[in-house]
């Protein structure tokens, strides 16, 4: 019985020490760089339509929705209410530039497209890009499926923006670019 307890103690003691040491290691989240202060403190945002590439333009024109990324982001931002929406860049603290692209992805002889929404946040004073969020939008053959996938992309983009804009200056909860 003494041998069993000694063996058990001999096994558990190092396991406990290693787990304690591991618990003391900084986590990835605690090492995250801070979110730029302008994103956290900004009050007014101008939403810019940064357009789309040629492939995407053709698709949006066929659907008679050439400004859909801009319109959907504008509506989502208005609904969220975190930032006041400015009518001119000069009146804003930040510019949110929305762009839609469909990168060509080639694998051997098969070519496909990878549609994505891209939101770049600019500081109006310095004109520097502070942050970029990119969210994929799954392709579709049917319009109803495309509408659903596009809405999911906008929702995912807004969810990530909310995490970034709602964090403390430590940035511990934000995904870094």
Model-derived segments and spans:
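N-terminal secretory signal peptides that target proteins for export/translocation
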Residues: 1-5
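Surface-exposed short loop/turn segments
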Residues: 25-26, 79-84, 89-144, 148
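Bacterial N-terminal signal peptides
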Residues: 9-19
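A structural "domain/chain start" motif
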Residues: 21-79, 100-103, 132-135, 142, ...
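A generic short-segment signal for beta-strand/edge and adjacent turn/coil regions
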Residues: 10, 62-68, 85-89
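Two-component system phosphotransfer/interaction surface
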Residues: 151-166
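Solvent-exposed, acidic/flexible segments
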Residues: 59-70, 110-115, 143-154
């Amino acid at each position: 019985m003494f041998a069993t307890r000694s063996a058990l103690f001999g096994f558990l003691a190092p396991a406990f020490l290693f787990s304690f040491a591991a618990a003391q290691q900084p986590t990835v989240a605690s090492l995250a760089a801070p979110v730029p202060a302008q994103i956290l403190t900004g009050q007014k945002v101008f939403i810019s339509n940064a357009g789309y590439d040629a492939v995407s333009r053709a698709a949006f024109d066929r659907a008679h929705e050439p400004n859909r990324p801009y319109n959907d982001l504008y509506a989502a931002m208005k609904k969220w209410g975190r930032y006041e929406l400015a009518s001119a860049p000069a009146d804003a603290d930040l510019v949110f530039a929305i762009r839609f692209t469909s990168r060509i992805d080639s694998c051997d002889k098969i070519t496909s497209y990878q549609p994505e929404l891209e939101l770049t946040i600019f500081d109006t004073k310095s004109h520097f890009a502070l942050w970029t969020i990119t969210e994929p939008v799954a392709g579709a053959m049917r319009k109803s499926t495309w509408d659903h996938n596009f809405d999911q992309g906008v929702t995912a983009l807004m969810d990530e923006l909310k995490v970034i804009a709602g964090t403390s200056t430590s940035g511990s909860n934000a995904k870094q670019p």
